Amino acid sequence: MGFMKRATFALGLSILLLFALPALAQSNAAEEAQHRAEVLRSLPQNAARRLFAVPASPAQLPAGAIGAYGKGCAAGAIRLEPDGPGWQVMRPSRARNFGHPKLVASIKALAAGAQQDGWPGLLVGDMAQPRGGPMLTGHASHQLGLEVDIWLTPAPAGRRLTLEEREEMSAIDLVQPDLLDVYPERFTPAHLALLRRAALMPDVDRIFVNAAIKQAACRSETGERGWLRKVRPWEGHTYHFHVALKCTDPRCGNRNSIPAGDGCGKELARWFREEVRFPKGKRQPPKILTLADLPKACGQVLAAP
């Protein structure tokens, strides 16, 4: 990267770090513990979310992704170290820094490439539990060990966060309250480069961001636009982007294929309708899955040493 590009990155990141907000992007350790306790009190004993929250180590089985992204489990997952060259794991008390070996390798590759682009370091959010499966809090997917949330906040340059900071600090919200656009001073060329690099990784199936962030990427990209196809609008995702890898395990099912094109036209515009941004009415609570709702092999994953 040339001097002028690096200078632009540095300026953008310096501005971004001035806008850290007090509102938490994710629950801190105490809030998470309280939420988990409340969920556990309400769940039946056979709820899959309860069962998969117990194991503290991965299943000693060959690595595999079993089932669907929102109804499955992970065999032979490995742990992403809390610290590495170019990344730091956030909210480590959750023990959600596990994934398929392909996911761990992809995170490390993204961290290395992003540093070359001038991003100081990745702050890695939730991956999967040691054996995947449904989680007590926070996610409908993240069950196969093939997904990771990457904060849209860069790591501080030149230092490691303390354990307290990792448990307590907030990510930075890039999207304005009306959900119609990003804050122009917060979405920087560095963010565009990070999303581009992630989308161009061959194992990545798709990336979820808020529609306002997708829109900002669409209008900011002046070069080759094919990578934008993988960047998909979704509700929330104003503080982080969600990376999902392709599943090559015959025991799992991939999502539907992504439509052709860069996704910057009519299919994006619908996300800015008021009824989509702020839906009215109560949502039906999701079905409480039991182990019987998951693939049979997930029982073997739970029972494995």
Which role fits each region the language model picked out?
Residues A48, F52-P55, S106-T137, F208-K230:
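Extended, low-complexity, intrinsically disordered C-terminal regulatory tails
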Residues Q26-L43, E164-P305:
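Catalytic cores and adjacent binding grooves of peptidoglycan-active enzymes
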Residues A53-G125, F187-L194, M201-V204:
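Active-site acidic/histidine clusters and adjacent loop/turn architecture
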Residues A10-A20:
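Bacterial N-terminal signal peptides
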